[in-house]
């Protein structure tokens, strides 16, 4: 009679994502607010005590009062809408073109040979230095502003799309091909997820470059926009309006970056990076 020994199978161990306590998250949020609040309070105190001349740098409270006044009469809203429209159009045009060319250069050897060399040469030129040439090509109207934003957004998205595709492990693509996945399925299930982290980085850099380009573009023969509002205020020495315009640009950049971070976290739930300690 044979004797059978039963051996228990080891329990499956799954790695759980680290859970950050709610109290720790709340403390971190407060820490991120401390330095801006201290900076604004110091600015206000320096302006009120006369360390900063009002005509050079007005107090934050005066800038906020000016912003409230321009918001009530609709001036700020009109200029803000025009700036957002230009930024959105430029980002869409430059981003789509960069995405297509970056994908072609990253996936195809022929595309790499034909597309990448001229793009590499063009990126050595400061796009803001092309303003005189762009004026000759597209005039000094809306096309100039949108073209500057599109150029500013193009290069970060192109290079990060290209690098994201090239950094994908070729063995994953071969495994997908072995499993019978067609080209479209490989692009969807292997290439796109692998390139997304790099693509999001390119988008964040592109947004910053787009706002910088818009600042310059709206100071060239513009009739509306935050940049035009600042230039008009400069002529009348309205420093509070100039500072308000700078704060609006800064807030637009911050809000767009935060929105992109939220979208990135939701789309890349599978990706676990290093947490700051």
Tell me the role of every PLM-derived stretch.
Residues 117, 160, 164-205, 230:
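Short cytoplasmic-facing helical segments at TM-TM junctions of multi-pass membrane proteins
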Residues 109, 166, 197, 201, ...:
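C-terminal transmembrane helix and the adjacent membrane-cytosol boundary/short C-terminal tail
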Residues 1-37, 258-277:
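Transmembrane alpha-helical segments of polytopic membrane transport and secretion proteins
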Residues 147, 151, 183-217, 240, ...:
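Transmembrane alpha-helices
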Residues 89-119:
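Transmembrane-helix boundary motif in ABC transporter permease subunits
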Residues 120-156, 163-164:
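Generic hydrophobic transmembrane alpha-helix motif, especially the helices
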Residues 86, 232-253:
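Pore-lining and gate-forming transmembrane alpha-helices of multi-pass membrane transport proteins
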Residues 18-26, 49-93:
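Periplasmic/extracellular loop-to-transmembrane helix junction in inner-membrane transport proteins
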